[in-house]
């Protein structure tokens, strides 16, 4: 895929190089550097992968997406594109790379402090009984048409998420059902995905602290973001936080 096509929908500035490059894959782990790949530099909680840009180019990477300035003299020959949020750009580019598979399935997202896993399994069972072919992503892994794969996070990183959607679609799934965590929303793992149905189970003080959410109000606000990207919302009206969340 041409770099310019990969960047469809992404706001960027071309700092160096050409958009006519052929890109075979996207990486955000510097250890996977290879010719034909684009490296997305992400500012993490433990380290800043902009520090590995030169190493990646030396390993053959042909394009870089950066969130802040880097020393261009250390990345000769590579295309360099600057964006406001590299995580957001990773999500949109990953969707483009895999043909935006979520647009060709019914998308259902479930959020809440407790009950996400149970709820998704129940929904999956009901839909399958009705004849739907369902792919499911969540805390217990990925399930589709008799297959099971482990996952590192409740809501996987955007690249893995889009790759999984592609696998669902290629296998014949017509519905993608997933747990949507507040971290997944905050870290743009689900950026670019529109849900046909969003489901809210409940909310209680949890995931508050270093590396997660600073306050309960922030946590609630991120949970509510799911309902800004869905067509229909199904909520627990008995939860005292529902009105504020919406």
Region spans (language model):
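Switch II (G3) loop of P-loop NTPases
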Residues: 173-183
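Residue-level signal for inorganic ion chemistry
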Residues: 6, 37, 56, 93, ...
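P-loop NTPase switch/communication element
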Residues: 140-160, 164
């Amino acid at each position: 895929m041409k770099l310019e096509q990969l960047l469809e929908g992404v706001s960027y500035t071309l700092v160096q190089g050409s958009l006519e490059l052929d890109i075979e894959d996207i990486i955000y782990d510097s250890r996977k550097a290879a010719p034909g790949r684009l490296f997305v530099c992400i500012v993490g909680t433990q380290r800043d992968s902009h520090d590995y840009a030169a190493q990646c180019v030396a390993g053959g990477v042909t394009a870089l997406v950066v969130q802040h300035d880097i020393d261009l003299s250390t990345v000769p020959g590579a295309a360099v594109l600057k964006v406001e949020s590299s995580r957001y750009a990773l999500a949109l580019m990953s969707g483009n790379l895999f043909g935006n598979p979520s647009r060709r399935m019914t998308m259902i997202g479930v959020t809440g402090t407790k009950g996400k896993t149970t709820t998704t399994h129940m929904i999956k069972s009901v839909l399958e009984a009705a004849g739907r072919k369902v792919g499911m992503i969540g805390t217990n892994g990925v399930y589709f048409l008799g297959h099971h794969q482990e996952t590192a996070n409740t809501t996987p990183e955007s690249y893995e998420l889009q790759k999984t959607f592609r696998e669902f679609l290629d296998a014949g799934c017509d519905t993608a059902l997933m747990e949507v965590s507040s971290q997944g929303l905050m870290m743009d793992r689900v950026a670019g995905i529109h849900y046909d149905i969003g489901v809210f189970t409940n909310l209680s003080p949890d995931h508050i602290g270093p590396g997660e959410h600073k306050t309960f109000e922030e946590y609630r606000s991120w949970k509510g973001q799911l309902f800004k990207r869905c067509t229909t919302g199904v909520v627990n009206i008995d939860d005292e936080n529902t009105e504020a969340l919406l």
